[in-house]
C-alpha cells in the first residue's frame, strides 16, 4: 500500500473525519435537506423558496457570459462534481476494486441490468400510449447511491460486509447505466462545433494523463473547458464529469493520485453538493400536484417501477447470474439479504429526481413525478430495512456478532 492510500485509510482518520465520511451521516444530511425544502415550499414562506430557486446567477470572463437561474447552476454545474466523483469510483473499481475481474462483475452487473429493465418496462406498460409521459421511462430505473448505502450503513454489523460490497457495485453499475441513458435519451439539438471542442478538450486531458501531470489545477482548467463545450453541444453536461474522471491517472510518480482526489472530494459531495441538489429539487408544492395524474398511469408507473420493478428486476438478475454460473452468491450473504438490498435499490430519490427534471418540462408533471419518486423511494427504503432487520434476526452468525 502506498503512503497516500495509507493516509486515506480509516485507521488514520480522526474521530471527526470518520463522522464526516460516514454514509449514515451523509444520508441524514440528505434527508434533512429534502424535509426542509418540502416543509418550506408548503409553508406561508413558499415565495422566498421560489425566489432562491430562480435567483439569477452568471459567470463572466471578458466578453463571455454564462447566465442561468440558480437551480440550473445546481443541476448542471455542481452536479457535474457529483458525476465526476462517480466516474472516479467506477474507474478505481474497474482497475483495482470490486469490478476488476469477470466473476466479481457478473452478479452486481446482472442485478443492475435487471433493476433497470424491469422498472422501465413497468413504467412503459402504464404509459406507452402517452407521447408526453413516455419520456419518463428512465425515472424509476435510477438508484440513489448515497441514500441507499446510507440506509445500509444504519444497520451496521447487522448486515455482512459482502452485502455492502454487492450493493455498492450494483449502485455503481446502475449509475453508469443512468449516465448512458442521460447521454443517449435526453440530449437534443446537437452542435457539431461544440462537440469538436469537447473532443479537443478530452484529447488534452488524455495527453495530461499520458504525461502523468501531477497538477490538479491543469485537469480542472481543461475540465471546465470540456464541461462548457459539452454544455453547449446539446449532450447533457453530466457526461463531462465522467469523461474528466476517466482521464485522471491512477498514480503519478508512484503516489496515489486518483484515490486522493476521490478521498478529498467525497465529503464535499456527500455533505454539500448532493444535499444542495436535494434541497433545490425536493420542494414539492402539494397544492400544485395533480392528484388525478398522481394516481393515474404516470404516478403509478413510477411508484410501482421503483418499489416493485427494482426488487423484481434485481432478484431476476441475481438469479439468472447464479443459474448460468457466471456469478455466485457470497457464502455469508443469504437470499434474504439480497432481497433486502434489492428493495434498497428502489430508493431513487436524487437520481430519479435528476432524470425527471430532464424528462419533463411542464411544472405540474414535474411535481407529480417528484412526489411519486418520493413515495416509491420511501416504500422501498422501509421495505428494505424491515427485510434486512428480519434477515439479521434469522442469521445466527450475524446475530451473535458484536455491534
Swiss-Prot record:
Source taxonomy: Bacteria, Pseudomonadati, Pseudomonadota, Alphaproteobacteria, Maricaulales
Reaction(s) catalysed by this chain's protein: Na(+)(in) + 2 H(+)(out) = Na(+)(out) + 2 H(+)(in)
Gene behind this protein: nhaA
GO molecular function: sodium:proton antiporter activity
Organism, scientific name: Maricaulis maris (strain MCS10)
Domain of life of the source: Bacteria
Keyword Nucleotide-binding part of the UniProt annotation: no
Name listed for the protein in its UniProt record: Na(+)/H(+) antiporter NhaA
Protein location: Cell inner membrane
Keyword Lipid metabolism applies: no
Classification via PANTHER family: NA(+)_H(+) ANTIPORTER NHAA (PTHR30341:SF0), SODIUM ION/PROTON ANTIPORTER NHAA-RELATED (PTHR30341)
Amino acid at each position: 500500500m502506498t503512503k497516500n492510500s495509507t493516509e486515506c485509510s480509516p485507521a488514520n482518520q480522526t474521530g471527526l473525519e470518520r463522522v464526516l465520511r460516514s454514509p449514515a451521516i451523509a444520508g441524514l444530511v440528505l434527508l434533512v435537506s429534502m424535509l426542509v425544502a418540502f416543509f418550506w415550499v408548503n409553508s406561508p414562506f413558499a415565495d422566498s423558496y421560489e425566489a432562491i430557486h430562480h435567483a439569477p446567477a452568471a459567470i463572466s470572463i471578458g466578453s463571455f457570459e454564462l447566465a442561468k437561474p440558480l437551480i440550473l447552476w445546481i443541476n448542471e454545474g455542481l452536479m457535474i462534481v457529483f458525476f465526476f466523483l462517480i466516474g472516479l469510483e467506477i474507474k478505481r473499481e474497474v482497475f483495482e476494486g470490486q469490478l476488476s475481474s469477470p466473476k466479481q462483475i457478473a452478479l452486481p452487473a446482472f442485478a443492475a441490468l435487471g433493476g433497470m429493465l424491469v422498472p422501465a418496462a413497468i413504467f412503459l406498460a402504464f404509459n406507452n400510449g402517452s407521447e408526453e409521459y413516455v419520456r419518463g421511462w428512465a425515472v424509476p430505473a435510477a438508484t440513489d447511491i448515497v441514500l441507499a448505502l446510507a440506509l445500509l450503513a444504519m444497520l451496521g454489523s447487522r448486515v455482512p460486509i459482502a452485502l455492502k460490497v454487492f450493493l455498492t457495485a450494483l449502485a455503481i453499475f446502475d449509475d453508469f447505466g443512468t449516465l448512458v441513458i442521460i447521454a443517449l435519451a435526453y440530449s437534443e439539438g446537437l452542435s457539431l462545433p461544440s462537440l469538436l471542442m469537447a473532443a479537443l478538450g478530452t484529447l488534452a486531458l488524455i495527453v495530461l494523463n499520458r504525461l502523468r501531470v501531477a497538477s490538479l489545477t491543469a485537469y480542472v482548467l481543461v475540465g471546465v473547458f470540456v464541461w462548457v463545450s459539452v454544455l453547449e453541444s446539446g449532450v447533457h453536461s453530466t457526461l463531462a464529469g465522467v469523461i474528466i474522471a476517466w482521464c485522471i491517472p491512477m498514480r503519478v510518480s508512484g503516489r496515489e493520485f486518483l484515490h486522493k482526489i476521490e478521498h478529498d472530494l467525497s465529503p464535499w459531495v456527500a455533505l454539500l453538493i448532493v444535499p444542495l441538489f436535494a434541497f433545490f429539487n425536493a420542494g414539492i408544492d402539494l397544492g400544485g400536484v395533480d392528484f388525478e395524474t398522481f394516481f393515474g398511469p404516470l404516478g403509478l408507473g413510477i411508484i410501482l417501477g421503483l418499489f416493485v420493478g427494482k426488487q423484481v428486476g434485481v432478484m431476476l438478475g441475481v438469479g439468472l447470474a447464479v443459474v448460468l454460473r457466471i456469478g455466485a452468491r457470497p457464502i455469508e450473504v443469504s437470499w434474504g439479504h439480497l432481497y433486502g438490498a434489492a428493495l434498497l435499490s428502489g430508493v431513487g430519490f436524487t437520481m430519479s429526481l435528476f432524470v425527471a427534471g430532464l424528462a419533463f418540462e411542464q411544472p405540474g408533471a414535474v411535481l407529480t413525478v417528484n412526489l411519486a419518486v418520493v413515495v416509491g423511494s420511501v416504500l422501498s427504503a422501509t421495505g428494505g430495512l424491515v427485510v434486512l432487520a428480519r434477515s439479521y434476526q434469522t442469521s445466527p452468525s450475524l446475530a451473535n456478532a458484536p455491534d
